[in-house]
Amino acid sequence: MTRTLQALITLVVLSADTTGAEFTLRIIDESDQPISGAKLNIILHRQNDPRYSSSQLIEDKTGADGTFSFSAKADMSLSRIDVFKEGFYPCLIMETQDGIYSMAPKQSYTFGMPRRHRPTSLHARKVNITSKPGQLPENTWLGYDFEKGAFVSPHGKGEIADIRFHLSSSQDGPRVTSEEMARDRANPDLQKWTELDFTRLHNDWKFALQVAFPEPGSGIIAEPRNWPYCELRMPPFAPEGGYLPSLEMKLSTRGPFPHAADRDYPGYFLRTRVKLAPDGSVASAHYTKIVGYLYYVHHQLSFTYYYNPTPNDRGLELAPGKNIFKWRRGISPIEEINYFPEYEP
């Protein structure tokens, strides 16, 4: 090989290695206003190279328009973005709905970083009710008390129904062959299964969850804004209006499924315990948020909520260590984290 050809090959390789891509990050607050001066720590990794030594760190700030642009080599991809600014909830961006890990990464990203307004004491709890005889019956309206953290009588010790749930399910045809059914029934490990257990296993199902409220003016509204990479996933204040008196959700084990992952599903705001003025306006109400989705299937219901006990206070920022629900004897540290959140998950 001649020296001229070797030099040409070297030049081509170097040119390919330095050919880069331009990236632009835009940081906005919960009102879609640009955030200037936000500190950025951006980590890029070389594709198909697990070595930390191949990564690149960029540290800078957003400009007056809330944006920051930078370039990277063609073989580098975004791996992690940390965003900080005093008075805002910090963000750790590694995997989002848009996905900086997507198969076809974009060159422009917009991320929300909500302001820290006035964190306060809230009732915060992760509800996870599984199938137990008489605990969560289907085709029955079940009231849930956000302040007590329990279903109302006769299914729990709750006193006031903030919200009412109605679960139902129906078979949607067999999902396995008759031979597979016979094999499962002959399995010694499944000898304690009931006929209902086998019916649930061997069939596809349709599920429906209805949500309603006991008094006029109360309701629920879906919140499209979602920052799963941020300490505060939803806007800090519940909206003043727009609440629906009821909501029905349906899904099937055949799909398509309405949500791919808990962290990618926004949530809901709720207005409950409403007292109306003589002119029909809302004189008093309590506000709650459900972070993520309402999971329901057969005799199972789970959701995470944050309830403000102060009437007419729409603020729903949980202050660290200010969860009104406290640890009690018999709850493990893991359960304390899961069921008594100290911050928004």
Question: What do the PLM-derived regions correspond to, one by one?
Answer:
Residues 97-129:
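Extracellular beta-sheet/turn segments enriched in Thr/Pro/Gly and aliphatic residues
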Residues 23-36, 116, 130-135:
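Structural motif
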Residues 116-279, 305-315, 323-345:
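A domain-level signal for the mature, folded cores of soluble proteins
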Residues 31-50, 76:
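Short, ordered, surface-exposed loop/turn motifs in non-cytosolic proteins
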Residues 55, 75-99:
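A short, solvent-exposed loop/turn motif at the edges and junctions
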Residues 1-10:
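Sec-dependent signal peptide recognition
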Residues 9-33, 41-43:
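Beta-strand-rich domain onsets/edges
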Residues 47-71:
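Short, acidic Ser/Thr/Gly-rich low-complexity loop/linker segments typical of extracellular
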